[in-house]
Amino acid sequence: MNSINVKIKRIRPEKGNPLPRYMTAHAAGVDLCADLDQELVLEPGERTLVPTGIAIELPEGYEAQIRPRSGLALKHGISLVNSPGTIDADYRGEIGVIVINHGNEPFVISNNERIAQMVFAPFTRAVFQDVAELGETARGEGGFGHTGR
């Protein structure tokens, strides 16, 4: 299993909120917790930015992906609007999670509640070549369900 060193800063250290952590030995992502002064009620169809109380410094060549938690999605219809969200290596601000309630009931988010997961990944940057034509393939321009439903 590979690992990288990630510097982490607590935005409000006096609150003593937990740092992200892996919940199982083989988990790909760490859980991110809400950093709230009071409970937040998310009505059906409503979205909001939830602070996490942390900022990170990633090594060059890496990104962090913010993803929904499957249990919240299945049980409550809670997801992320921009999924996955991307944290770039040069971003130093507080990580915020844009949460949306796709469920039928209001959803209460409490301080320290696990609201999303963060996965670290290397990335490759493209060097674009401006061309007049692209190579032919059997698929061609077919897309958006052209192979079936």
Curated annotation (Swiss-Prot):
Keyword list, A-Z: Hydrolase, Magnesium, Metal-binding, Nucleotide metabolism
Positions bound to substrate: R69, S70, G71, N82, T86, I87, D88
Function according to Swiss-Prot or TrEMBL: This enzyme is involved in nucleotide metabolism: it produces dUMP, the immediate precursor of thymidine nucleotides and it decreases the intracellular concentration of dUTP so that uracil cannot be incorporated into DNA.
Any one GO biological process: dUMP biosynthetic process
InterPro entries recorded: dUTPase (IPR008181), dUTPase-like (IPR029054), dUTPase-like_sf (IPR036157), dUTPase_trimeric (IPR033704)
Keyword Cell division: no
Pathway: Pyrimidine metabolism; dUMP biosynthesis; dUMP from dCTP (dUTP route): step 2/2
Cofactor: Mg(2+)
Gene Ontology terms for molecular function: dUTP diphosphatase activity; magnesium ion binding
Species: Geotalea daltonii (strain DSM 22248 / JCM 15807 / FRC-32)
Signal peptide residue numbers: none
Enzyme Commission numbers on file: 3.6.1.23
Catalytic activity: dUTP + H2O = dUMP + diphosphate + H(+)
Protein name as catalogued: Deoxyuridine 5'-triphosphate nucleotidohydrolase
SUPFAM superfamilies recorded: dUTPase-like
Family (UniProt): Belongs to the dUTPase family.
Keyword Hydrolase: yes
Matching HAMAP family: dUTPase_bact
